[in-house]
Amino acid sequence: LGDVYKRQALFNLEQGGHIYSRISNPTVQVLEERVAALEGGTAALATASGMSAIFLAIMTLCNTGDHVVVSSQLYGGTVNLFRLTLPKFGIKATFVKPRDTEGFKKAIQENTKCIFGELVGNPGNELMNMPEIVKIANEAGIPVIIDSTYQTPYLFKPLEHGADIVVHSLTKWMAGHGSS
């Protein structure tokens, strides 16, 4: 009978634990803990894909009528998310060249909720001026989201340089094969 009461407490969200494999399970929890440790973060959330991680991060911060400032050097799927998908939710994006710090500053609006970019843009390999971008975001009181798929925490840890949220597609370099 103890198991019944334990399950009841879990489903009523009265205590933490694994309820349903699609929500959480011990294996995914280990993955999340390891990615958080590699990044030097406090927590991580595993999703089905890197694109879903980006979408979830943006949708957590934004509502209809909001705006994001985005580096123009991004993976094509991410560009399409900001150009085609997010506008369907009423979220607008302004694209700025990764080294154009004045452009980032000018692009921030009253309804801007974050700055998003890749430290090293894929496919152009243009380096984002992260110290300046973080400074601009901090002055505006908005978070910086960095897609660090290309670097992995072995090469660069965005959180140590002022990023607030880091996303990855683990099927690229983090998984060790880089074949996706």
Task: Report the location of each language-model feature.
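Conserved N-terminal alpha-helix of the aminotransferase class I/II PLP-enzyme fold
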Residues: 7-55, 77-85
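Conserved PLP-enzyme active-site core in the AAT-like
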Residues: 44-180
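Short, small-residue-biased leader/transition segments that mark boundaries at the very start
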Residues: 1-5
